[in-house]
Every structure is written in C-alpha cells, then in structure tokens.
C-alpha cells in the first residue's frame, strides 16, 4: 500500500460556506520542492546575521584571549611615553 502524502488542512471561513476544510494544493513537482528547500529556504538576512555573529564571536574571543597582554603592553607603552615626555617638560 502506497502512502499518500499527508498535507496540512486549513479551515477557511467564507461568507457562502461557513466552514470548509481545504487541502493545500501541490502546484510544483517534488524535486523542485526539494531543491527549493535546500537552496531557497535560507534567507539572505540569516546568512548575514550568521556572518556577523561569527565575526563578533571571533573578535570577543580574540579580545579575551589577548586582553591582559594588550592591556599590559598599552600601559607600559603609556608609561614609557610619560617617562620620555616628562623630563623634557621639566627641562623646559
């Protein structure tokens, strides 16, 4: 026995017929539908969002990874600059 594809039934309210169950019509061939599912189901905004999310995660991870190092280097650089610039100011 070949199983028929079960399609969702929607109840549509009409002025003439108060309640009528209607079956969803299959207007396209199954292969095309499969292809559409594989390709067309992913919206462009989702792709961009995923790219953004990946970028954000990467940057956050990177910053966390290099936070202490970068902070110390920045501090030391600033200290060095102050040490270098201060004597000249004092001299003037």
UniProtKB/Swiss-Prot annotation:
Protein name, entry field: Putative protein pog
């Amino acid at each position: 026995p070949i199983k028929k594809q079960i399609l969702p039934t929607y109840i549509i309210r009409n002025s003439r017929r108060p309640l009528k169950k209607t079956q969803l019509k299959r207007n396209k061939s199954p292969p095309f539908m499969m292809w559409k599912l594989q390709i067309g189901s992913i919206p462009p905004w989702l792709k961009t969002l995923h790219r953004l999310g990946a970028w954000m995660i990467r940057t956050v991870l990177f910053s966390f990874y290099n936070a202490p190092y970068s902070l110390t280097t920045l501090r030391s650089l600033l200290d060095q600059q102050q040490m270098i610039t201060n004597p000249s100011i004092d001299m003037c």
